[in-house]
Amino acid sequence: MAIPMRPRLLAALAPTFLGFLLLQVAVGAGTPPGKAFNLTWISTDFKTILEWQPKPTNYTYTVQISDRSRNWKYKCTGTTDTECDLTDEIVKDVNWTYEARVLSVPWRNSTHGKETLFGTHGEEPPFTNARKFLPYRDTKIGQPVIQKYEQGGTKLKVTVKDSFTLVRKNGTFLTLRQVFGNDLGYILTYRKDSSTGRKTNTTHTNEFLIDVEKGVSYCFFAQAVIFSRKTNHKSPESITKCTEQWKSVLGETLIIVGAVVFLVTVFIILLTISLCKRRKNRAGQKRKNTPSRLA
């Protein structure tokens, strides 16, 4: 005997409805719908944040990071954010490889409101591991700043500022140079102001001294580089700076012209005074040589 259409439809939809019902019951009981994903380290000059997805519903996140003893340390416990600042942990030793993971911890409704069910019945909450993070190798270098520059004759001198990091020693923040030593260098890319052709110069210090053409303006920018790295070895480009040799040449020209005008003016004044004195002397001599008339 054929089954009527409506009971057949209900029979087909029953598993779907049951699954949906169980999902709602699980969520209501505090079971997290899933684990964190897209775990990403965001780190510049050792300022380090771990980010992930998605935004939690009916559960919270807790981050764990391994210390040098291989023990898990809890950070950002019971947070509903999707990021956690781990800077204070990773700057303790920038040459250590850190492991981190994000745990999804469900809520539980109680007489005290919502509470987190952490490690219920001895079971560990679902978690997702982040990739291993070695600060010395993985932190990005921030945009450098050109501190000062000077072009004189055929030489251009450029000094790059030695930026501070969040790494501390004896309570004092260390500079990039103090952390990386000779592994840190800078690349200067420069060109004539009126040209598109570029040249580069590399230094292991913070200063450049390059040969240029006299009286020609130059534009340039700097990049930090970590020589031992295969990836993330260059920083973003600094703000481009340009010398203004036309102003320098104009200034020198004005000084020369001004000096010439001053000397000419002084000469004219002295000549005028001298001529006036001569005229007076001649007039006086004339009066002496002219015989006086008798009354």
UniProtKB/Swiss-Prot annotation:
Subcellular location: Membrane
Primary subcellular site in the record, as a coarse category: membrane
Span of the signal peptide: 1-28
A GO BP annotation: positive regulation of endothelial cell apoptotic process
Topological domains, Extracellular: 29-252
GO cellular component term, pick one: extracellular space
Gene3D superfamilies, alphabetized: Immunoglobulins (2.60.40.10)
Cystine connections: C76-C84, C219-C242
Record flagged with keyword Transmembrane: yes
S-palmitoyl cysteine-type lipidated residues: C276
Record's keyword terms, sorted: Blood coagulation, Disulfide bond, Glycoprotein, Hemostasis, Lipoprotein, Membrane, Palmitate, Signal, Transmembrane, Transmembrane helix
SUPFAM superfamilies documented for this protein: Fibronectin type III
Entry's family note: Belongs to the tissue factor family.
Subunit text: Interacts with HSPE; the interaction, inhibited by heparin, promotes the generation of activated factor X and activates coagulation in the presence of activated factor VII.
Name of the featured protein: Tissue factor
Species the sequence originates in: Rattus norvegicus
Gene behind the chain: F3
